[in-house]
């Protein structure tokens, strides 16, 4: 499986972040073809205190080809263009990963 993860840094204006995430990021993400799962995490802290991140979003696809195909759609292009200014202003970190899960 392949994942696309976005980590939102803590910001002074949390309202703008929440509005962007709820009204833009999440609806576009959920509209991507081939999307298998979405995991959203509200960061509560880290082992040594407060984290610099506030929100994590992980989208899972069957494989890299499925992720690339999804991002090449009109919805995928709009999503990436919406996220780009956040990345350029260092308000998010984002990456793709070849991932696996193990059930215990």
How should these model regions be labeled?
Residues 1-104:
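Macromolecular interaction modules
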